[in-house]
Amino acid sequence: MTALDGIEGLSECIGRAIQEHLARSNLNLAWPQIDSLDRPILRFEAFIEDAGAVSTVASRSEKIASRTLDLTGMKTPQPSRSPTVTRNVATPHAEALHDRDDQESADDDDDDLQDDAAAQTASRKGTGGLRVANSQLIREDLSENQRQMQVDSRTFPKRRKVASEKFVFQPSTLDKLIIGIWEQAIFEQFQVAPNSVSSVVRHAPMDAAPVALSVTTEPSGGSFSQMNVFCRKVTQASRVCRSIEIIVQARWTELFEEQVQARTAAHPELSSTKHRKGVFMEACQDFGWSEKELRNKMAIWRGYKDVKDAAGWAALVFAGMGIYRFCKYRVGFDKEAMRRLKNLRNRLEVAADTLHPHWRQLLAIVGEPQALKYPGHPHEWVVYEDGSDPVPLRQTYIEHDPFFSFEHIEESVVDGSVWGCEDPRWMPQESAITRASGTYMCALCNEQQSDEPKLNACFCFPSLFGCVKRKPPPVQIYRTAEGKNNGLIALTAFERGTAVGELVGLITNGVRHLDVMEGSTPLAKYQIWQGREGNYTRFANHSCKANAQTSNFTWLDTQRVILVSKGIEAGSEITVDYGDKYWAGLDKSCLCGETCCRYKRDGRR
């Protein structure tokens, strides 16, 4: 191995350092020696010599480093030359340059020159008088923003909306409390037996025999059914006892304040703080608790009282476990929260009186009246968002129609004067096998349909069809503030793809100049008129940016029109797009207020 080969890294290091220095310095010097050469290069060689040698003829050691750098980029171009010049690497000048080299280093440098010449085989364009600095360019990574086409998620319809990658605000503690109250008031099987309040507060006799509960080890249909009934009763009783506990604790807080005021009025010479301390110590003695225990409990009970003062007794009776957390940690427990609860007071009482007629019997324990304020059907009352007193449904239409009447029905009624004994919504089964066997198959999921929950396998709209018991819808009819008369408001959220309700009414045909829903089957065309009878879907207003839509669904060979949610938030109005055919030729203007409104006509209502 030669010395040059052994220190090859030194040549590379020196060459790289010189090249970087020339690039950073941006040298712009006029070197006549460079301009006179066709392919100028910079050659450097390194030797080891004795610095103390006096003789002019000093013996050189063997060369330890050698490198050549191309200086063509520093050459000043001639204006008379062609814009593009093609250069051949193998030129006579280059060969002459090699001939002038020292004979000692000729063999070692031929390889370096050949490597540099191979890198300059490409054509070079001529430049102007200003030379471009030989600096490193910053290249953008194109892989970071490649404009690729993505598959649209709407190509594959989904029942539920996929989770968004963006940040979504979660409901506040107050929102969770309100939603929990609505869910308990609407969906919970809250039952209070009539005339049983006195038995709830009456102490059981000491000689009462305990009830023995035994469960057989062998599975039996009768014992299992009995256990189901017993467990349901215990769960309902526990739920009622929890409501009684909350209203009694709220009432005790009121009596505590009344006792302090009474003692202050009787003995004004003492401060109210001393009277409060005396009443507090008396309560600790009666409860058998320490001051710390009673003080912690009173802080929560005082929260119950504040909620009762704002939202009424119904908020306490139908509140779930969320009210305990809300009153204990008091997150968002401010004046704005109390204002929102106050606006919900009458609306909560409407739902409680119409869905749970016996709930006020619990208030007899705290001395409150038991008479219902809002009896009747849940959708027979029109509520207000600002907390005003609800009014009967007929009162909102009597100004325009003195003979207005509306009957709330669960199933559509076929107009016998038009269709006779036939139902125009009938959809025959496509398969001859299913027609012969008498079974009903769903056209969407291809599963068996039946009103018997044990036999039903179709769960396209489980809240409406094939369920054990259809629950009341979490909606109320409310008075809109935009001049649209009545509207439909959602008390809880409706997930995307879930059913809001079925459009029921009079199945007829030939109705003109009235709001109707048109439907058709392969055998007939029909109309659903909800002018005199129907359900809450009648009050869904139009919006050009609706959050619900109508959809056809066949159940037991009968076509139904379902109002399906597109994603409805709790507390928002439920709207549907009536369509172009409805607005064609109609002398009215759309009042939806959306920026994408399609039927806004100036000067019309």
Swiss-Prot record:
EC number in record: 2.1.1.-
Single biological process term from Gene Ontology: methylation
Superkingdom of origin organism: Eukaryota
Biased composition (Acidic residues): 104-115
Positions of the UniProt region annotated as Disordered: 68-132
Keywords: Methyltransferase, S-adenosyl-L-methionine, Transferase
GO MF terms, alphabetically ordered: histone H3 methyltransferase activity
Claim: S-adenosyl-L-methionine is one of the keywords in the record: yes
Compositionally skewed regions (Polar residues) per UniProt: 75-89
Residue span(s) of domain SET: 473-579
Enzyme class: transferase
Any one of the GO CC terms: chromatin
Family, per entry: Belongs to the class V-like SAM-binding methyltransferase superfamily.
Protein known as: SET domain-containing protein SNOG_11806
Organism annotation: Phaeosphaeria nodorum (strain SN15 / ATCC MYA-4574 / FGSC 10173) (Glume blotch fungus)
